[in-house]
Amino acid sequence: MKKVKILNLEFDNLSKAEFLENLESGVVFTPNVDHLIKLEKDPEFLQAYSISDYNLCDSKILIYASKFLGTPIKEKISGSDIFPAFYNYHKKNEEIKIFLLGAGKGVAFTAQNKINKKIGRNMVIATYSPPFGFEHDEKECQNIIDMINNSGATVLVVGVGAPKQEKWIYKYKDSLPFIKIFMALGATIDFEADNVKRAPKWMSEVGLEWLFRLLSEPQRLWKRYLVDDVFFFLLLFKQKIKLFIKKDRKGDSRIWEIADRL
């Protein structure tokens, strides 16, 4: 499987169709620009990514970045797109039984009903919307593990936001022996329940989904998009310089010294 490296993370260079054909088991993460910035600063988040079997590019900005680096990623595969594609792909596969963990009270249950109605069978067999701060409550986490293990689910979709969802999967994956596929999918459960409005398709296609989200939740997201994520472009430029210098092996050794410091 071909990989594309952007900053300190390798992405799987797959189309949506290739991913669905290949996925039989494993951990699926959908990194975006915000993930890459957090990975630079958060060792526990980076450690959580070490168990990921599939890193799917969930950002048009990262698609542009991969082209800038000379290693284009085939396709943007967001969590909110891949999940409906996944359950439709396995529509007749009785072995796929999904547990939804995340979203606000009652939202996951609404998503369950909507998905099962679309599919025509009870593919989503159980849900749970955990309380705020659940990840710090070991007793609550153990209750969640028991719920999942007793549900009969083979697929776990966790939608509690990054880096919380990835860290939770990393910590408790081995306590969930019946789960074959783990997916960390952010706001996907909210989207499936029609609880949160998605960006217009044209905005997603040109890389402006972040702007739609910022305008929808300015108080929560302004710092992420207007302060934290701006750092990404500096890091990307540094990576490009390194690649350029590596190609020019006849250059001045002083340039190599500069590259090593970047």
Q: What residues fall within each predicted segment?
A:
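Short, flexible loop segments at boundaries between secondary-structure elements
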Residues: P130-E135, F178-S216
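Conserved beta-alpha
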Residues: K67-G152
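Short gly/pro/ser/thr-enriched loop/turn and capping motifs at secondary-structure boundaries
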Residues: L62-Y64, K164, T188-A193
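A transmembrane-helix-recognition feature enriched in membrane-embedded lipid enzymes
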Residues: I61-S66, R198-I255
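Short Gly/Thr/Asp-enriched flexible loops that form oxyanion-binding sites at enzyme active sites
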Residues: A111-Q112, E166-S175
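A short helix->loop->beta-strand "cap" motif at the edges of active sites that frequently abuts
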Residues: S25, E94-I96, P177-I181
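Proline-aspartate-enriched helix->loop->beta-strand connector
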Residues: I148-V157, G161-A162
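N-terminal nucleotide/polyanion-binding subdomain common to many enzyme families
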Residues: M1-F83
